[in-house]
C-alpha cells in the first residue's frame, strides 16, 4: 500500500474544504438584495465590464454537478453500542489527488476489528466521527493524474485502513486490486482482510508444510474459513477448529479435520487426545488465557501466531471487566523459555502493514491465483443493507455467522423498508413484553420474598411463643417443687 496513513480522513478533509470554498459562491444565490439605485452611464459601463469579467469559466461549469453530488456513508459518531454507527448523506464530489482513484462501492466487508473499533478498542481507526470499514469492492469512476494501471470502469476490490463503508471512496490506486474474471462483488469484498491475514500467518510466518497440524480458533468466521481453505492447499494438513456444535457440519465440509465445541469441551484436552505431542501452528485471535493455552499446545519447532484479542469483546458496549481481565491475563514469555522449548511466538496485525505495498501485493497475488484455480472461495454468510448495519454487527458479535457478513450499498426498497420497520416494531413489542415479563417476575419474586419473610416472622413468633410456654411450664414446675 502507499504511505497514506488515513485516506479516509484526507477525503473528509477535502470535502470540508470544498464546502468552505463553495459557501461564498453559493451565498449570492440565496441572498435577497435591495433594488440598485439609478446609475450613471459610466457606472453602467463599469458594471457591464465587471459582468463580462465574471462570466463563468469552463471549470466553474462543474460546480452545479459538484453541488448536487451526494453519497451515503456509515459514520461512527462515538464509541458504544450498535446505534453509534449512523447512516448519513455526504455532499460534494471528493477531489482526486495525484495517484488516487474514485471507486463507486458495491459491497463492503464486515470484520471483527470493526466491532472492536466501535467500542474504541481498535487503535488503527481515527477518532470519531469517522467512517469505518477496511475493505470493499466496486467500479472505478474516476482516475487521478499519474495513474497508469487503472482506468474508469475497472472492477476492483479495495483494502484500506478505514473509510470503506460508504457509496463512494477515494483511495491510492495501490490500495486497489483488479477483480478476477467470474468473481462477484460479494466475494471481492469478502476476500482482502480475511485471506491476506490467513495467508501471511500460515505461509509467511508459519511456513506451513505437508503433514503438519494447525489449530484454528473461531473456525466458522471469515479468517477461520480462509485459514482452513488455505491449509487444504497443502497435502495432509490436520486442522483442529473450534466452533459451536451447530456449525460443525459446515466447517467439516470446508476442511476442518477435528471440529471442537469450545462451549462444552476443553479444546486443550480434545487436541491432546488426538495429537499428544502437540501442534505445529496455533492461530490465536482470542488473547488472554487462551494464548497461554495455545503456547503450551505447541510441539518442538511449533509456532504461536497471535492476531487479536476477541476475548475483550463482551456485549455491544465496552465491558471494562472483560478488557481488564484479558489484559491482565495477556501472555508473556521469557526468551529462555523459547530457547528451551524450541518454540516461537509471532504477532500479526494487518492494520500496521498498510504501507508495506510489496508484502500485501505478494500475498494478494498468491490468493488471487488460488481463487482462479478454484482452491479458495469466500463463503458469504449473509448480506445486509447499510441501513441494517446494526443487525449485521449484532449477528457477528453474537457469533451467529458462518462465513463473511457483507454490507451492500444498494438502497433498501420501499417494501423492504416497510418490512424492516415492521420488524423493528415487533422487536420493540417483544422487548416491551420481555420487560413486562421481567417486571412481573420481579414483582412476583418480591411478593414471594415478602411472603417468605412473613412466614419466617410467623415461625419466629411461634418459636418465641413455644419458648414462652416452655418457660411458663418451667416456672410452674419450680413453684410446685418449692411448695413440696
Curated annotation (Swiss-Prot):
Enzyme nomenclature, EC number:
1.-.-.-
- The domain of life for this entry's organism is Eukaryota
Identify this protein by name.
Synaptic vesicle membrane protein VAT-1 homolog
- Please give one Gene Ontology molecular function term for this protein: oxidoreductase activity
Listed transmembrane segments: none
InterPro entries annotated for this entry?
Answer: ADH-like_N (IPR013154), GroES-like_sf (IPR011032), NAD(P)-bd_dom_sf (IPR036291), PKS_ER (IPR020843), Quin_OxRdtase/zeta-crystal_CS (IPR002364), SV-ATPase_mito-regulator (IPR052100)
Which organism encodes this protein? Danio rerio
Any one cellular component term from GO for this entry?
Answer: mitochondrial outer membrane
A biological process term (GO) from this entry: negative regulation of mitochondrial fusion
Amino acid at each position: 500500500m502507499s504511505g497514506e496513513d488515513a485516506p479516509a480522513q484526507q477525503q473528509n478533509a477535502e470535502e470540508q474544504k470544498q464546502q468552505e470554498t463553495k459557501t461564498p459562491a453559493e451565498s449570492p444565490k440565496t441572498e435577497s438584495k435591495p433594488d440598485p439605485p439609478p446609475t450613471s452611464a459610466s457606472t453602467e459601463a463599469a458594471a457591464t465590464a465587471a459582468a463580462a469579467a465574471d462570466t463563468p469559466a469552463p471549470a466553474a461549469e462543474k460546480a452545479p454537478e459538484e453541488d448536487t453530488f451526494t453519497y451515503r456513508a456509515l459514520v461512527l459518531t462515538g464509541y458504544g453500542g450498535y446505534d453509534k454507527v449512523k447512516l448519513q448523506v455526504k455532499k460534494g464530489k471528493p477531489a482526486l489527488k495525484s495517484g488516487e482513484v474514485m471507486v463507486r462501492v458495491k459491497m463492503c466487508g464486515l470484520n471483527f476489528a470493526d466491532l472492536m473499533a466501535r467500542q474504541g478498542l481498535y487503535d488503527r481507526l481515527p477518532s470519531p466521527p469517522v467512517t469505518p470499514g477496511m475493505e470493499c469492492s466496486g467500479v472505478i469512476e474516476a482516475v487521478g493524474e499519474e495513474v497508469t494501471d487503472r482506468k474508469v470502469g475497472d472492477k476492483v476490490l479495495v483494502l484500506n485502513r478505514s473509510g470503506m463503508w460508504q457509496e463512494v471512496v477515494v483511495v491510492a490506486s495501490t490500495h486497489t486490486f483488479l477483480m478476477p474474471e467470474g468473481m462477484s462483488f460479494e466475494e471481492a469484498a469478502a476476500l482482502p482482510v480475511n485471506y491476506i491475514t490467513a495467508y501471511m500467518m500460515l505461509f509467511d510466518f508459519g511456513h506451513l508444510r505437508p503433514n503438519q497440524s494447525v489449530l484454528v480458533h473461531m473456525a466458522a468466521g471469515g479468517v477461520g474459513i480462509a485459514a482452513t481453505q488455505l491449509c487444504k492447499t497443502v497435502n495432509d494438513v490436520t486442522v483442529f477448529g473450534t466452533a459451536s456444535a451447530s456449525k460443525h457440519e459446515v466447517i467439516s465440509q470446508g476442511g476442518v479435520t477435528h471440529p471442537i465445541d469450545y462451549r462444552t469441551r476443553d479444546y486443550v484436552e480434545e487436541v491432546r487426545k488426538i495429537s499428544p505431542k502437540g501442534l505445529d501452528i496455533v492461530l490465536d485471535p482470542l488473547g488472554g488465557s487462551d494464548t497461554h493455552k495455545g503456547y503450551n499446545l505447541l510441539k518442538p519447532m511449533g509456532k504461536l501466531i497471535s492476531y487479536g484479542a476477541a476475548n475483550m469483546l463482551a456485549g455491544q458496549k465496552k465491558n471494562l471487566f472483560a478488557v481488564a481481565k484479558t489484559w491482565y491475563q495477556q501472555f508473556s514469555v521469557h526468551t529462555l523459555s523459547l530457547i528451551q522449548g524450541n518454540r516461537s511466538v509471532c504477532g500479526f496485525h494487518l492494520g500496521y502493514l498498510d504501507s508495506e505495498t510489496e508484502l500485501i501485493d505478494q500475498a494478494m497475488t498468491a490468493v488471487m491465483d488460488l481463487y482462479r484455480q478454484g482452491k479458495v472461495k469466500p463463503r458469504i454468510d449473509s448480506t445486509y443493507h447499510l441501513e441494517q448495519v446494526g443487525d449485521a454487527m449484532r449477528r457477528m458479535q453474537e457469533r451467529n455467522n458462518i462465513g463473511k457478513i457483507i454490507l451492500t450499498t444498494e438502497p433498501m426498497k420501499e417494501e423492504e423498508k416497510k418490512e424492516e420497520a415492521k420488524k423493528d416494531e415487533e422487536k420493540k413489542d417483544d422487548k416491551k413484553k420481555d420487560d413486562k415479563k421481567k417486571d412481573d417476575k420481579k414483582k412476583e419474586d418480591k411478593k414471594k420474598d415478602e411472603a417468605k419473610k412473613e412466614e419466617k416472622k410467623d415461625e419466629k413468633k411461634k418459636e418465641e411463643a413455644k419458648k414462652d410456654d416452655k418457660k411458663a411450664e418451667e416456672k410452674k414446675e419450680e413453684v410446685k417443687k418449692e411448695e413440696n
